Each structure stands twice: as structure tokens, then as C-alpha cells.
Amino acid sequence: LGDVHGGAGEQCAELYNDVAKIMEKEDIDIAVIQGLDKWREKYGEIVSGFGHRFHKPVDPRAPLLMSKVREAAENNVVSGVFADIGEKVQEEIGKQRGNKPIAMNIDGATAVIFCELGFPAPLSRGLFCLSRSVGILAHGWEQMQMGGRNKGPMPPSILPTYKSN
């Protein structure tokens, strides 16, 4: 787990929080441009949370999550401000690429969710690990329920013995 796998959501949440802070004095369009400029000064040209090497032109997971955020905003569960920011960032990156659209990926969408729920950006990596841990636990349990030997160290009773002559 590093800055690309697991850390991208943290970096994206940092961007969204920076944009939200700028929005205290500027409108969303200006805030997004300034936020992206600040982010790129720190991290470089590629913006975490957007684009995917396999899911093109759309990461199919992101629109589903974003629709759930929009639904929660309609029901006053969350504000929807970070959903607006995420979608505006996506739009602005596309404009800056010569009107070439870019997909919000799963990290961009989960960063929206974490920000909407009030989690500080540094907790995003831990939340990513937590969700993966639940999946690993479920997979292990499923394998155990199938019966038979589960992959792992060989029991000592069936290890081959090597004797020198």
C-alpha cells in the first residue's frame, strides 16, 4: 500500500478539502482551478482520483457511488458539496486536457464519500485498508466453508523428509 494503491484516495481528499477551503472566498470554478494548481505544485501533473489504465472512458464503479452520494444529499444526509467539487474537478481536468474527458476513478469517488462524511484526508488510507480487510476476511471464510485443505503451510506430518546417505 503506497501513494498509488491506497494513497490516491488520501491525496484526492486533500485536493477536495483544499478546494472547499478556497470556496470560502471564491466560487467553485475558481476554487477548483486554484486547488488543482496547488495540488500539481505538490504532487505533479497526474491528479490522483482521476483516470484509470483499464477503465476507459468510465470507471464503472464511480458513477454508482456518486449516485448514492447524490441520493444521500437529496435526503439531507450529506451536503453534496464534495460531490459538486469532485465532478467540477473532473470537468476542469478534461478542459485542461483540451476538452478530452477523464474518468473519475474509484479513489476519486471514495474521496468524495470520505469528505462528505467528515473524515480528515489522512484517514482515507486507513479506510481503504479497512474495506480491503473485510473482503479478505470474507474470502478466507468462504474458502474454509468449502472444505478440504486451504492453501498455506504444509502440515509437518506430510512434509517430505530428506535423508542424506
Label for each model-derived stretch:
Residues 1-165:
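Non-transmembrane, aqueous-exposed alpha-helical and coiled segments at domain scale
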